[in-house]
Swiss-Prot record:
NCBIfam families, per the entry: PRK00179.1 (NF001211)
Catalyzed chemical reaction(s): alpha-D-glucose 6-phosphate = beta-D-fructose 6-phosphate
Gene: pgi
The protein's name: Glucose-6-phosphate isomerase
Molecular-function GO terms, alphabetical: carbohydrate derivative binding; glucose-6-phosphate isomerase activity; monosaccharide binding
Length: 548
């Protein structure tokens, strides 16, 4: 990938000038001027997804200038580089090929002169065989009973993705009960294990190196819990599998290396649900549905790689995000799924975006002079409406929002879904168009009150509007459409990282805290007073020691 500071490009300077013309333009005025605005600023994908970005503070000229920025920063070249297996993760000297994991066309993808697809397909075949045995009851625990519960032990990408997807696809789940343990806080593993039966529980230990502190601490506690009933260590092999590449450590733990599922250095943690890390997904919904998830993502990969930028959904959403983050000064983006099954989707892309693009050093190794990744947050609707929407509607912060909803519910109870979707449609309309003082006074007048009687309260009921949103309407949340939606956001993040001249696929920011924790851990062992840190850290450690 090229090293181009976006703020020094002609396109960026043109956008700065354009912003001066646009900063006071309202969304309502843009709709008033153009009754075809929706048609111009919306697009569909595979008759499964409608993306409406018309309720944004953009014009055709805005998008043309943003597209010019993408062109000047060589986005097209970067997309080709990723899809062709170039080592675009330069700080770790790795290719970035989560797209290979879901390459349903099976066309060769070459890294270091070697086609990776045969290995990818071999692991998928091994996963299918394993899933068929466990789901079908052929796999037995040490007392001859079939598996009823699966516990995935991982953290970060080895937890967030599988947990999010298994929750989103609960309507497709089989009889197996899925559990996820990530936090090194002993409460997490203890509470998870309380209702489980060691005779019918299978553990998946997800750690590429088999050395991740949190994961291995939990794995050893799970092993101890299991052996407190099973006693004989030879039984571990019937109740533990590994998602790892460290065969030696896996074997020493007691896991049969035939039940070790590998993945590769070119699979980043937060993009790993498509790999063997997704084994918990396949066990939960069946391997055929896991393949549909891969197929949906592959369809979006093709869209991203082949569709012109002007109609390319990940690129369009990425450019709009840069517009708000760097020109309007918006520091956050909210992801608001109007589907309870999707309740972990915002948290998943909180990691996906913030760990990818939360960087202050450009690809040239120098601090940047512009904004990079935004803060990502969100909760399911309508819960959020009764929590934080107040600030989005009437606060002083600009919070661009993505609203996501399915047209068809998996649980068509009474009129629940109609009420849910009425809120979905109403919120974006309210955020865009607001309510003027005149409208507020007219509403009061309709109840028989005079302007004098309501003067003290009317200003507080005014909604300025002009709050930007994207609406993503899915036909239904299926494995295929969910795969496409996840890939849409993945490629949006990649696009922004390319344009903002940062490396999106490393995460050096997680290292310092881990290093210091490893230094502090032995200091917590005794009762001696600690003096090796700053006064604040020393005081906190010493108070902890006195209270424990």
């Amino acid at each position: 990938m090229k090293n181009i500071n976006p703020s020094q490009t002609a396109a960026w300077k043109a956008l700065q000038q354009h912003f001066e013309q646009m900063k006071d333009v309202t969304i309502s005025s843009l709709f008033a001027k153009d009754d075809q605005r929706f048609n111009q600023f919306s697009a569909t994908f595979d008759d499964q997804m409608l993306v409406d970005f018309s309720k944004n503070r953009i014009t055709r000229e805005t998008m043309e200038k943003l597209q010019a920025l993408a062109k000047e920063t060589d986005l097209a070249g970067a997309i080709k580089a990723m899809f062709s297996g170039e080592k675009i993760n330069r700080t770790e000297d790795r290719a970035v090929l989560h797209i290979a994991l879901r390459n349903r066309s099976n066309t060769p993808i070459v890294v270091d002169g070697k086609d990776v697809m045969p290995e990818v397909n071999a692991v998928l075949a091994k996963m299918k065989q394993f899933c068929d045995r466990v789901i079908g009851g052929e796999w037995k625990g040490y007392t001859g009973k079939a598996i009823t519960d699966v516990v995935n032990i991982g953290i970060g990408g080895s937890d967030l993705g599988p947990y999010m997807v298994t929750e989103a696809l609960r309507p497709y789940k089989n009889h197996l009960n899925m559990h996820f343990v990530s936090n090194v806080d002993g409460t997490h593993i203890a509470e998870t294990l309380k209702p489980l039966n060691p005779e019918t529980t299978l553990f998946l230990v997800a750690s590429k190196t088999f050395t991740t502190q949190e994961t291995m601490t939990n794995a050893h506690s799970a092993r101890d819990w299991f052996l407190s009933t099973a006693s004989d260590e030879k039984h571990v092999a019937k109740h533990f599998a590994a998602l790892s590449t460290n065969a030696k450590a896996v074997g020493e733990f007691g896991i049969d290396t035939n039940n070790m599922f590998e993945f590769w250095d070119w699979v980043g943690g937060r993009y790993s649900l498509w790999s063997a890390i997704g084994l918990s997904i396949a066990l939960s919904v069946g391997f055929e549905n896991f393949e549909q998830l891969l197929s949906g993502a592959h369809a979006m990969d093709k869209h991203f790689a082949e569709t012109p930028a002007e109609k390319n959904l990940p690129i369009l959403l990425a450019l709009i995000g840069i517009w708000y983050n760097n020109f309007f000064g918006a520091e956050t983006e909210a992801i608001l799924p109007y589907d309870q099954y999707m309740h972990r989707f915002p948290a998943y892309f909180q990691q996906g975006n913030m760990e990818s693009n939360g960087k202050y050093v450009g690809r040239d190794g120098k601090p940047v002079d512009y904004q990079t990744g935004p803060i990502i947050w969100g909760e399911p609707g309508t819960n959020g409406q009764h929590a934080f929407y107040q600030l989005i509607h009437q606060g002083t912060k600009l919070v661009p929002c993505d609203f996501i909803a399915p047209a068809i519910s998996h649980n068509p109870l009474s009129d629940h879904h109609a009420k849910l979707l009425s809120n979905f449609f109403a919120q974006t309309e309210a955020l865009a168009f607001g309510k003027s003082l005149a409208e507020v006074e007219a509403e009061f007048a309709a109840t028989g009150k005079t302007p004098e009687q309501v003067a003290h309260v009317a200003p507080f009921k005014v909604f300025e509007g002009n709050r930007p949103t994207n609406s993503i309407l899915l036909r239904e949340i299926t494995p295929f459409s969910l795969g496409a939606l996840i890939a849409l956001y993945e490629h949006k993040i990649f696009t922004q990282g390319v344009i903002l001249n940062i490396y999106s696929f490393d995460q050096w920011g997680v290292e310092l805290g881990k290093q210091l924790a490893n230094r502090i851990l032995p200091e917590l062992a005794g009762d001696e007073k600690v003096t090796s840190h700053d006064s604040s850290t020393n005081a906190l450690i010493n108070r902890f020691k006195s209270w424990r």
